[in-house]
Amino acid sequence: MDEQTGTFNPRVLWPDVIRLPQNRWIFTCKEIIDRLGTDVHKTAEMKKLMEKCLMYLYFMKKSLNLFDYTYVEASILFFRYWYYYGLSYNLLDSIHISQAILVTACKTMENNRPIDAYVKSTCEFVTIHKIPVGNAGPRPNMDKLKWEFRDRLVKNEKKLLCQFGFDFNDGVGNARELIEEIFSGFYRFNRDDILPDEFKKTAFPKILQESRMFIVQGMTQPVTLLCDGYKFVVMSLIYCGLEYKRLVDKNFRYPKNFFSRVLLPSLKFNTQELVETFMDYRILEDNFFDLKSNKGSKLHISEEMIRNITDEDNDFCHSNEELFDYEHIREGNVSKEFMEHIQSKVDAMYEKYKTKV
């Protein structure tokens, strides 16, 4: 019993086992670049090392047939680890850390696989890329190597959990997962039902597919340290919308208040912020990895360009329309308007069925 209020306080007898962390995961462009250091030779060596680790993550994605959002999560955790703790200049040690990061991402985002699956594929990567393994020589004993990699994985996984402070469910980092949630079948069937058919059936499916690709390709640069997943989703839609306008339909424009309707209530950023983030993204590309997937000058996006493909009353702010908010509905907060909407959808489906019969 609480002596002051006379009420039962469960935390006195059963305190929280782990205090929920609130870590900082978003940084300025300057902070990210400064993390590389000022020594030219060490910076070049570190970037080469990081690029090899990113190659490893992509190799594991293909080898284990991982979902896109699992690969994205692994990349997010990799850059966060690098920013806070750095990487060993020993390539094999960094691969071991990357392996633990990948396993943690799999456990966070999807069903875990047997540990042997990770170890086997990691050994294959090390062998294919001829990464030196101690004194084992160019052709190490695979059975011995697997046991060594297995032991390192178990050790590093425990270490990683502590280093991240058990903060793996921030909920705003994984843009690849978020874009599927924002445009899930539920929302397409309800919230987006009023959108023009030409946009829903012709333009948007192509833009959405390209946006998914934009997000996955973005994981090869530390852009996840620059902005959260929600902003990166909006950036992907803006970028791919501009590309669609340039390559397919010169008159393309998103429907009125499209972004205001799909954003969460807590989100609010203006066009200028998006322009600055695109520019910072380009600066990161110039300072980190020279890859075929880099967007280069296409990231020079102005406010005018964004306004030419959007039509928002309140910039990029939520419209406060909670009618189709799945989180509210799941908690039982269902409005009369939503019930009437569902009834109209059921009636329409029934009439469509009758005409076929």
UniProtKB/Swiss-Prot annotation:
Component of the BUR kinase complex involved in transcription regulation. This complex phosphorylates the UBC2/RAD6 ubiquitin-conjugating enzyme (E2), leading to monoubiquitination of histone H2B and the silencing of telomeric-associated genes. Also required for histone H3 methylation. Necessary for the recovery from pheromone-induced growth arrest in the cell cycle G1 phase. The kinase activity of the complex requires the presence of BUR2. Overexpression of BUR2 interferes with mitotic chromosome segregation. Gene3D superfamilies: Cyclin-like. InterPro entries: Cyclin-like_sf (IPR036915). GO terms for molecular function: cyclin-dependent protein serine/threonine kinase regulator activity. One of its GO terms (biological process) is transcription elongation by RNA polymerase II. Keywords: Cell cycle, Nucleus, Transcription, Transcription regulation. Belongs to the BUR kinase complex. The gene is BUR2. This is Protein BUR2. It comes from Candida glabrata (strain ATCC 2001 / BCRC 20586 / JCM 3761 / NBRC 0622 / NRRL Y-65 / CBS 138). GO terms for cellular component: cyclin-dependent protein kinase holoenzyme complex; nucleus. It comes from the Eukaryota.
